[in-house]
Amino acid sequence: MSTLKVVSSKLAAEIDKELMGPQIGFTLQQLMELAGFSVAQAVCRQFPLRGKTETEKGKHVFVIAGPGNNGGDGLVCARHLKLFGYNPVVFYPKRSERTEFYKQLVHQLNFFKVPVLSQDEGNWLEYLKPEKTLCIVDAIFGFSFKPPMREPFKGIVEELCKVQNIIPIVSVDVPTGWDVDKGPISQPSINPAVLVSLTVPKPCSSHIRENQTTHYVGGRFIPRDFANKFGFEPFGYESTDQILKL
C-alpha cells in the first residue's frame, strides 16, 4: 500500500471530525490538551533548561494565541511549560467567545500565575527582545487560515517577522500566514525555527527550510488501523514521548 507523509487540509478536517464523532468519542478539549502538551514537549526538547545559567532560565517563552483552536493549543502549551519549569507569558489579543472552554483555559493560566496579556496592553512588544525571551510560540492561525490576514494579527506578525532571525519561533501545526496546502502565500508570513505538525504533517511542511527549521510531529492519539484508513503510517514515537523529530 502506498502511504502519504502529509495530509491535505480537507483530509485533516475529516480526521478531526471522525475522531470527535460518536463512534470514537474524543472531545475537542481532549485533543487540544494532547496537542498543546506535545508542543510544550517540543519546546523542552529544542530549548532545554538543563545546563543553562539562572539568567537564561529566567527568560520567557512568549506564547501568542489566536482566537481559534490553534490558539487553544497555545494556551495549553503555556500551562505545561510552566509545570516544566519554564517562564511562559501569553499574549491573547482576541479572545475566543466560542465556548466556555477557552475561558477555562485562561482561568487555568491565572491559577498557575502565567501572565495573560490583552490587546490593550502595549507592553507585549517588550517580549520581542532576545535578552528577555527564549523563544516565541506561534499559535495564531492553523490549517483553516484563509487570507487576507486582518488586524490585530497582521501587525503582530509583521513585528514577529522583524525578530524571527534573532528569536526562534516555534509554529504550531501551520506557520501563521501560510496556506496549509500551498505554503507561504500571505504577506507577512513567518519562517519558523521549529515546526510542530499535529497528528500528521500538512503539505505546507514541504516548504520549510530544511537547514534552518527543525520539524517535529506531535499529537499521539491515533492507532495504526485508523492512520492506514487515511493513507499514512503512524509515527514511531519512542517510549512515552509525545513528539518525534522528523
Curated annotation (Swiss-Prot):
Cross-referenced Pfam families: YjeF_N
Family the UniProt entry places it in: Belongs to the NnrE/AIBP family.
Gene: NNR1
Record carries keyword Membrane: no
Keyword Cytoplasm in record: yes
Name of the protein in question: NAD(P)H-hydrate epimerase
Gene Ontology molecular-function annotations: metal ion binding; NAD(P)HX epimerase activity; nucleotide binding
Residues reported in the UniProt entry to bind K(+): N70, D138, T176
GO CC annotation terms, alphabetical: cytoplasm; mitochondrion
Sites where the protein binds (6S)-NADPHX: N69, N70, G71, G72, D73, G142, F143, S144, F145, K146, P147, P148, D173
Transmembrane segments annotated in the record for this chain: none
Start and end residues of each YjeF N-terminal domain: 12-234
Enzyme Commission number(s) of this protein: 5.1.99.6
Cofactor note: Binds 1 potassium ion per subunit.
Top-level taxon of the source organism: Eukaryota
Gene Ontology biological process terms from the UniProt entry: nicotinamide nucleotide metabolic process
Cofactor entry: K(+)
More about this protein: Present with 1380 molecules/cell in log phase SD medium.
